[in-house]
């Protein structure tokens, strides 16, 4: 019985270090000049904007100061809409164009026609002017003449013709004879119950107005107290009132007017 060892990890192929080719050694660069001095190179060009240590303008201020810089910048463009029509929608895609001959046929080559029309128009205008001049000469030579008597006779004839043509309606023309006898028709009410007693209207005589002459006498009004009198009273006046108190019945009023029955007769 033979026995053979197998490396199962060898099947995975993870042993890269042994299979990889050995890397070549790096080449060492040897400089000819071993001095530590810097190479003689030209200095960088200085920026004049950074020399003053100021911030460069931006925005609208930069656009105003640096007008020449904006020439290199493209202007803003409007974005195309999503629903815009195609550029060939309003143009013919057949490739056919109207030639000069077709245009003259369609619209009419009116160069010769316009010239002929102008010539004919001038000829017609000249002929009309000649005809008008002849008519004016004839009318100027033949002036109508008429006497006063002939004119009055013509007026009378025209009046007679006008009066004869008018037909005036005469009075009562076309009246009917049946309406000559006029009758007044009154509506009478039927009496269902005749009353035996007739009501008599009472005649009431009007009363005459009686005017009375009266001598009216009115009592004088109470005397008014004067304004601005002394306030208070005399100092040291008697205390208390009179003995027995105030009189009964109060103060008397103004005198009543005398009434006589003779001045007021009974009605």
Swiss-Prot record:
Key words, A-Z: Coiled coil, Cytoplasm
Biased amino acid composition, Acidic residues: 117-138
Main location class: cytoplasm
Function: Ribosome preservation factor that protect a small pool of nontranslating, vacant ribosomes in cells under nutrient starvation conditions. Under nutrient-limiting conditions, cells reduce ribosome biogenesis and degrade ribosomes via autophagy (ribophagy) or proteasomal degradation. To avoid excessive degradation during starvation, STM1 binds to and protects 80S ribosomes from proteasomal degradation. Under nutrient-sufficient conditions, TORC1 phosphorylates and inhibits STM1 to prevent formation of dormant 80S ribosomes.
GO biological process annotation, one example: TOR signaling
PTM characteristics: Phosphorylation by TORC1 upon nutrient replenishment inhibits STM1 and causes its release from dormant ribosomes.
Name of the gene encoding the protein in the UniProt record: STM1
Protein name in UniProt: Ribosome-associated protein STM1
Chain positions covered by the region annotation Disordered: 1-145, 161-182, 216-267
GO cellular component annotations of the record: cytoplasm; nucleus
């Amino acid at each position: 019985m033979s026995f053979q060892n197998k490396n199962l990890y060898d099947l995975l192929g993870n042993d890269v270090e042994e299979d990889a080719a050995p890397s070549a050694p790096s080449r060492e660069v040897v400089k000819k000049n071993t001095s530590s001095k810097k190479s003689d190179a030209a200095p960088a060009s200085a920026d004049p904007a950074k020399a003053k240590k100021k911030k460069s303008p931006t925005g609208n201020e930069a656009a105003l100061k640096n007008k020449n810089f904006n020439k290199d910048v493209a202007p803003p463009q409007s974005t195309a809409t999503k629903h815009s029509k195609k550029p060939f929608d309003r143009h013919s895609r057949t490739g056919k164009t109207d030639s000069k001959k077709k245009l003259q046929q369609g619209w009419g080559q009116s160069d010769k026609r316009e010239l002929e029309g102008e010539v004919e128009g001038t000829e017609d205008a000249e002929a009309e002017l000649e005809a008008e001049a002849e008519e004016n000469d004839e009318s100027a030579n033949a002036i109508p003449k008429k006497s006063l008597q002939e004119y009055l006779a013509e007026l009378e004839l025209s009046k007679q013709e006008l009066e004869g043509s008018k037909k005036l309606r005469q009075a009562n023309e076309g009246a009917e004879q049946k309406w000559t006898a006029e009758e007044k028709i009154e509506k009478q009410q039927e009496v269902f119950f005749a009353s035996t007693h007739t009501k008599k209207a009472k005649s009431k005589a009007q009363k005459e107005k009686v005017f009375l002459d009266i001598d009216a006498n009115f009592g004088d009004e109470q005397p008014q107290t004067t304004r601005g009198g002394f306030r208070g009273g005399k100092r040291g006046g008697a205390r208390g009132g009179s003995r027995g108190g105030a009189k009964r019945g109060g103060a008397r009023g103004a005198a009543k007017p005398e009434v006589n029955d003779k001045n007021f007769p009974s009605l």
